[in-house]
Amino acid sequence: MAERGGEGGAERGGDRGDFGRGFGGGRGGGRGRDRGPRGRGRRGGRASEETKWVPVTKLGRLVADNKITKLEQIYLHSLPVKEYQIIDHLVGPTLKDEVMKIMPVQKQTRAGQRTRFKAFVVVGDGNGHVGLGVKCSKEVATAIRGAIILAKLSVVPVRRGYWGNKIGKPHTVPCKVTGKCGSVTVRMVPAPRGSGIVAARVPKKVLQFAGIDDVFTSSRGSTKTLGNFVKATFDCLQKTYGFLTPEFWKETRFSRSPYQEHTDFLSTKAVSATKVITEGEDQA
C-alpha cells in the first residue's frame, strides 16, 4: 500500500494518495492557461461589428450611398430620422454632446422601491443644429448611452438672424421667441453683436451647442427643475422655424422628395436583396 501510494501517487502528481495533487490535474489542471484572453477577444470583435453601419430604412440607404449629403435636404421634406447613424454620417465629428444631469428616480412596487437613473443629454454642432435626449435606465452608463442616441434622433435646425443691419453671419435669434415646459417659461430676445449669451447655466450650454452667439434671455417658473428648464429652452429653439417672415413670402418652388428622385436606386437595392434571399433558400 505504501508503494502504491508513493510511486503511483508520485506519478499522478503528488503525495495525496491515489488522488494526486490538484484533483483532476491531468484533465483540467491547465484549463485556461494556453488559450489566451477569452473574454477580451470577443468584446473586441463586437466593437468592430458595431462600427460598421448597415442601414435599415430608405433614408439610411440614401445617406449611406451619399445620395443625401446635408441635413437640410431631410428637413425640407420632413423625413423622419429613425437611425442615429444618419446624424453621425452627415454631421460627423463636429457633433458634440454633454450630460446635463443624472438624477435617480424611484417607483414603488410590491417588493419595495425600484431605483433607476434618468439622464439628460444635449448634442449640437455649434452651427444651427441641436438635439435633446432623455433616457431612464437601471444603470447610469446605459441611460447616458440611450440619451445620446435619442438626442441625435431629435436633432432640429435652429434659425438664426440679426439684431440690426444684416452684416456678416447670423449671430442671434431672428425675433423674440418663447418656449414652455411645465411651469418653466423661457423667453429669448435678439441681442446686438458682442453682447454674448446672457442666460443661466442650463440654457447657455444649449444655446452654445445651437450656434447662437448673442442673445438676451429671461425665465420664469420653477427653473430649479432642470429637466423642464432644458426642455423649455429646446422648445424655444424649435419655434424659430415656426413662423413666416417677409423673406419667406416668395413663391415656393416645390422639389421632388428624395424617395421619388431616387426611386430606381431604392427599388434595385430591394430587388437584389430579395434575390439573394431567394437564392439562399433555393440552395438550402
From Swiss-Prot:
GO BP field: translation
GO molecular function, one term: structural constituent of ribosome
Organism (species): Arabidopsis thaliana
Similarity comment: Belongs to the universal ribosomal protein uS5 family.
NCBIfam families per the UniProt record, alphabetical: uS5_euk_arch
One of the record's GO cellular component terms: plasmodesma
Regions that span the bilayer: none
Coiled coil: none
Gene: RPS2A
Full protein name: Small ribosomal subunit protein uS5z
Residues covered by the S5 DRBM domain: 95-158
Entry annotated with the keyword Cytoplasm: no
Biased composition (Basic and acidic residues): 1-19
PROSITE patterns per record: RIBOSOMAL_S5, S5_DSRBD
Annotated region (Disordered), positions in chain: 1-51
Regions of compositional bias (Gly residues) in chain numbering: 20-29
